[in-house]
Design a protein with these regions (language model features):
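Hydrophobic helical h-region of N-terminal Sec-dependent signal peptides
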Residues: 9-13
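N-terminal signal peptide c-region/cleavage motif recognized by signal peptidases
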Residues: 16-18
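Bacterial N-terminal signal peptides that target proteins for export
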Residues: 1-8
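N-terminal accessory segment detector
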Residues: 21-144, 151-155, 159-178
Length: 178
């Protein structure tokens, strides 16, 4: 009996510590509070991830990046209705691309019937040193956006062209000749 009492006395502190440690695991842990800048960057990353995984999904089903861009254009072009001039389309694109931290745009040339502008490629860093993320290359990502914007421009009655000039996308939007 004396041995049992000694064992209880010896193990009681260990049992108490184990019980208290279990209670501590039930404490609520704080969740991270992101700054506005962190929220902005995270939101933009998620938009890019959705587009990238959409391209990947299309490819995994035997479709091309062009098919994906056309699908997105057909789906979303009606939301661009109300845009009447090339300048209006540029303004809409500018609003969308401002979502990307580090985005810059410069006007090159403008007239009543056409605009030419360029914007940088801040999304490029998402693709890392190998230029690919989630099975999609930066080239495919840009091709998908080019096809999408071409589809939207045609839907609105414009010609659209896009080319790379080092780290800039150079875009021209013109009224179609009637």
């Amino acid at each position: 009996m004396k041995k049992i009492k000694l064992m209880i006395i010896a193990f009681l502190p260990l049992l108490t510590t184990a019980v208290l440690a279990q209670d501590q695991n039930n404490e609520k842990k704080p969740l991270p509070e992101l700054t506005l800048e962190q929220k902005w960057q995270r939101s933009n990353w998620l938009v890019d991830v959705m587009m990238i995984t959409g391209i990947n999904q299309a490819k995994s089903h035997g479709n091309t990046v062009k098919n994906w861009g056309e699908f997105m254009g057909e789906l979303l072009a009606p939301g661009w209705e109300g845009i009447k001039t090339p300048w209006d389309m540029l303004r809409a694109m500018y609003r969308n691309y401002q979502l990307t931290p580090g985005f810059e745009m410069q006007m090159i040339k403008e007239s009543n019937d056409a605009v030419t502008f360029r914007f940088n490629r801040p999304y490029k860093s998402r693709f890392g040193d190998i230029g690919e993320v989630y099975g999609v290359s930066v080239k495919e990502y840009e091709k998908g956006l080019e096809v999408f914007h071409t589809y939207v421009a045609n839907h609105l009655g414009f010609n659209y062209s896009q080319r790379l000039d080092r780290d800039w996308n150079v875009i021209s939007i013109r009224n179609k000749k009637r």
